[in-house]
């Protein structure tokens, strides 16, 4: 199937002014377009324009937007809906039907204006939002086009076994967009279409073998919006280097599964072992301390990290397992008293009310910081990683601590979601305890961590839209030619 390309006339009808990277994507006729762009660079907007163009320019076309989750798919789906409703006011030979809850959009095409006598429906174009976390639901369809959003987070098997076969009958096209996540299949597909020569941030660029069906596009966020470069460079000061390079620089980083890429900047301190405690320094009356408390149950360890807020160094770390709730709280109270009644930041999620009641009963000054979601965990860990890269994290020079930090990694779930956890059957109690403690630390550059509020999921509801407006375009074929290059 020959891919039609949208024209400037079509862009004008949408009120859309593509920047140079978006325009290159639209002008490409490759069957597999791979766009690796930084955040807020217009990937989703360009993808939505491509979908709308197909729905109008090729009556009867069938296409999907597929993302790691339905919430992510809904972003581009929603943009497509907005644009389709706008265009339906221009073309009286079309009728739009939206089923919001099912993420299903229909564009009915007629042989004359819909409200004209004898109007006959000649074709129906369909666009649907899909999630990659249920691959079996992607099988069996026959499609003209597919858009993959955040493709680097989707397992390759979902593409090869479920998605690509849907394009085989009609020789359909795929637009594969994402920020990079290491050197996975998205990286390999990107190299198959990259013809830009050697470029920093793209390993093996310049020596890669290309495929005639592929064309790739690459740009950091500041390449697209050069006037905002200063803002992006400022952001670099507040997020981990690895995250910045991937999310904004659109770099393919080979060691991206390691959460703490700044381990070489970690300050290691001599300590004295006293029972279950690793003591770097005893209490200093003129200093303020806080304790990050990660409680363990069953085979997990409980870890209490005492942070000197004046120096930014861990003064003491206590690690134990097999202790009852009462025993854990008793030890935490003793540790707090030994460091001037240091206040405690405690992860109370998943341990029930028993811990909170025990903390209250013991009169411990504590702030609950429940790590109740992957979002909260990621924010805490990212803050610790950022401080580490700045050389502002100091811990006892202990093999167990270093191994746990080194083995804390990014993983991809079967549904394509990225999670942080210990390697294999390892523990992450030390990591979480340190992250809780350092969430209270004001860095040497004045940076202070603040936990962002989680946004509630949007409610979905059934919605039906019918738009019939007459305009100069009265003939469907003429209308199609008007915005097809």
Curated annotation (Swiss-Prot):
Changing residue 300 to N: No effect on nuclease activity. The keyword Glycoprotein does not apply. GO terms for molecular function: ATP binding; ATP hydrolysis activity; endonuclease activity; metal ion binding. Its EC number is 3.6.4.-, 3.1.21.-. Keywords: ATP-binding, Endonuclease, Hydrolase, Magnesium, Metal-binding, Nuclease, Nucleotide-binding, Viral genome packaging, Viral release from host cell. The record marks 428 as: Possible stabilization of Magnesium 1. Belongs to the Tequatrovirus large terminase family. The N-terminus contains an ATPase domain. The C-terminus contains an endonuclease domain. This is Terminase, large subunit. It comes from Thermus phage G20c.
